[in-house]
A protein has these predicted regions:
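Perimembrane helix-loop-helix junctions
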Residues: 222-233, 258-289
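Membrane-interface alpha helices of multi-pass inner-membrane proteins
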Residues: 200-201, 236-255, 260-266
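Short acidic/glycine- and proline-prone juxtamembrane loop motifs at membrane-interface regions
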Residues: 205-212
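Interfacial juxtamembrane loops and adjacent helix segments
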Residues: 68-163
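Start-transfer (signal-anchor) and selected internal transmembrane alpha helices
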Residues: 1-40, 279-285, 386-395, 455-465
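Transmembrane-helix signature of polytopic, membrane-embedded enzymes
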Residues: 153-158, 177-198
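Hydrophobic alpha-helical membrane-interfacial segments at the cytosolic entry of transmembrane helices
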Residues: 239-247, 271-298, 391-400, 460-466
C-alpha cells in the first residue's frame, strides 16, 4: 500500500523577506543611511581646516553669529577683514602647515590640545577673510546653527568647528533626501552625485559650497517634479512658495548659478492655472530673484576687492583688458580646457584637502562613466520633459552659468592677461550636474536601445553596493593622507 508523502517542513523565515528588503532600499533611504555613516566618519577623520578655504568659511560663519551679516572692513590693499577672538587664530595655527604638503600628517595630540583652548570672546584681533567675506549668510545657515549651539554650551572654538561640520552634514543629508524624493526620474545619477567623494568631502567640512550645492540640486529636482505634474492648476500656494524660497536661496548662495532659474520654463503654464495667474507668479519669481541677485552683487568685492593675495591679480585691470579685447576670452577658455580640463574632472569627482591629493585616474574615469550609465532608463516612468524642450531650456542655462564661473575665476584669481584660467575647479560643476542629468535621461528615453535589461530594484541594489565601495575606498584614502 502506498502511503501519501508528507510535505517538507516550511522555513520559519518568510520567503518574502529578501524582496521586502529590496523594496525598502529606495535611493533616498539608501542615501540617508550611507551619507550619515560615512559622512560622520569623514567629519572625524578630516583634520581641522583641511578643506579648501575651511578656515575662512569658519571665520565667516562665526562672524555671522556675531551679527555681522554684511562684511565691510577692508585693509589698505582692499582685502576683507574682520574682528575675531584670538582663540580662532590659535586653534588654526597648528594645522596651517598641512595644506599643499603631503609629507605633513595630522597629530591627534594637536587636536586634543586645540579642544582645550577656550573661546575668550573679549580678546580679539583683526584677521583677513579674503575669499569668504562677501558670502551671504544663506550659505552658512547650518554652520551658524552649529556654532551657536557651541556658544550656548560654552565650548571652545575647535569644538564649534566640529559642531558646524556636523550641522552642515545633516543639512546635506536632509536636502539630498528631499531632492531624491522629488525627482525619482533622475534618482540614480543624482544618488551617485550626492555620494560622490567630492560631495561627501565638502559635506563633512564647514564649507559654504554645501548649502550652495544642496539648494541648487533641490531647486532643479523640485522644478523637474513640478514640470511633470499630471493635473492642470496643480501648483498651489504651498508649491509656489517652495519654488520662490528655493529660487531666492540659489540667488543668495552664489549668483553664478542664477541662470539655473531658467529651468522654471520647464514647468507648463497650465500647471500654474489661468494664464493671468501664470504671468503674475512668474513675474513675482523673476522680480524677487532679480532683487536678491542685485543685492548679492552689491555686497560683493567689486573690481577693487582682493581675493587672491598676489600683486599679479587685479580684477579691475583684468576687466579693462577684456573690455578692450573681448574676443580673447574664447582662446583663453580653449587653452584652459586643454591645460586644466583633466584637473577640473579630477576635482569634480574627488579632491582631498587644499588641492593636496587627487584620486587615481581609473577611479575618476570609472565614476564619470557610472554617472553617465546611471542616466540610462529601465522604463518610461516616471515621466520626463520632452528631450527637445529640456535641451533648449537647460543647456543654455548651464553654459551661461559655467561662463560666469569661468569669468569670475579669470577676474579674481588669474594673473592679468594670463593665457588660461586659474582657480577653476570641478566642484563648481556639482550644482549644474542635475540639470545635465535631466537632459541626458530625457534624450536616452527616446531610443529603445538605451535601456537597462533589469528591474529598478536590481539597479538600485547595484548602485548602493557601488556607492558603499566608493565611500569605503575614499575614506581609506583620506585616512592614509592625514594619518598614514
Amino acid at each position: 500500500m502506498n502511503l501519501p508523502r508528507a510535505n517538507p517542513p516550511t522555513s520559519a523565515v518568510p520567503a518574502t523577506s529578501a524582496s521586502s528588503l529590496a523594496r525598502w532600499i529606495t535611493p533616498e533611504r539608501a542615501f540617508a543611511v550611507i551619507a550619515f555613516l560615512f559622512g560622520h566618519a569623514l567629519v572625524l577623520v578630516i583634520p581641522p581646516f583641511q578643506a579648501a578655504d575651511e578656515p575662512f568659511h569658519f571665520l565667516r560663519a562665526y562672524q555671522i553669529t556675531d551679527g555681522v551679516f554684511i562684511s565691510r572692513q577692508h585693509d589698505a590693499r582692499g582685502v576683507a577683514m574682520g574682528e575675531f577672538p584670538v582663540s580662532l587664530y590659535q586653534v588654526w595655527l597648528p594645522f596651517s602647515y598641512m595644506g599643499f604638503n603631503l609629507s605633513v600628517k595630522a597629530s591627534l595630540q594637536d587636536i586634543r590640545d586645540g579642544l582645550r583652548i577656550r573661546l575668550n570672546p573679549a580678546k580679539r584681533m583683526r584677521i583677513a577673510i579674503p575669499s569668504t567675506a562677501y558670502y551671504s549668510p544663506a550659505c552658512y545657515l547650518p554652520q551658524c546653527a552649529g556654532i551657536m549651539i557651541g556658544r550656548a554650551l560654552g565650548v571652545g572654538p575647535l569644538a564649534m568647528l566640529y559642531l558646524g561640520r556636523e550641522a552642515n552634514l545633516l543639512a546635506w543629508i536632509l536636502l539630498g533626501y528631499a531632492s531624491l524624493r522629488a525627482a525619482p526620474m533622475i534618482a540614480r545619477p543624482l544618488f551617485l552625485l550626492l555620494l560622490m567623494p567630492m560631495s561627501m568631502y565638502l559635506a563633512s567640512t564647514a564649507s559654504a559650497d554645501v548649502s550652495t550645492n544642496a539648494f541648487a540640486v533641490l531647486f532643479t529636482a523640485t522644478v523637474l517634479k513640478y514640470s511633470v505634474l499630471p493635473q492642470p492648476d496643480s501648483i498651489g500656494p504651498a508649491r509656489f512658495l517652495a519654488l520662490l524660497m528655493l529660487s531666492l536661496a540659489v540667488c543668495l548662495c552664489k549668483f553664478a548659478y542664477v541662470p539655473l532659474l531658467a529651468l522654471l520654463l520647464l514647468i507648463p503654464p497650465r500647471n500654474f492655472g489661468r494664464p493671468a495667474r501664470y504671468a503674475a507668479q512668474i513675474l513675482v519669481l523673476a522680480a524677487a530673484s532679480a532683487s536678491v541677485w542685485l543685492f548679492s552683487i552689491s555686497i560683493g568685492p567689486g573690481l577693487d576687492g582682493k581675493i587672491r593675495l598676489t600683486d599679479e591679480v587685479s580684477a579691475r585691470m583684468q576687466f579693462q583688458w577684456l573690455a578692450h579685447h573681448p574676443l580673447r576670452f574664447a582662446p583663453v577658455l580653449l587653452q584652459t580646457f586643454r591645460l586644466k580640463g583633466w584637473v577640473v574632472l579630477q576635482s569634480y569627482v574627488g579632491l582631498i584637502g587644499w588641492l593636496d591629493m587627487f584620486l587615481p585616474a581609473a577611479f575618476v574615469i570609472g565614476y564619470l562613466i557610472l554617472l553617465i550609465l546611471a542616466c540610462l532608463p529601465n522604463d518610461d516612468k516616471p515621466p520626463l520633459p520632452p528631450p527637445w524642450r529640456a535641451a533648449v531650456i537647460v543647456l543654455p542655462a548651464v553654459v551661461c552659468s559655467f561662463l560666469i564661473i569661468a569669468l569670475l575665476s579669470y577676474l579674481y584669481w588669474t594673473p592679468v592677461q594670463a593665457a588660461f584660467i586659474d582657480g577653476l575647479t570641478g566642484r563648481y560643476l556639482i550644482p549644474l550636474s542635475p540639470a545635465v542629468f535631466l537632459v541626458m535621461s530625457s534624450a536616452m528615453r527616446r531610443d529603445s536601445r538605451f535601456r537597462w535589461p533589469c528591474s529598478a530594484r536590481t539597479l538600485n541594489a547595484l548602485m548602493v553596493l557601488i556607492s558603499i565601495f566608493a565611500c569605503i575606498y575614499f575614506l581609506a584614502v583620506v585616512r592614509n593622507r592625514y594619518y598614514g
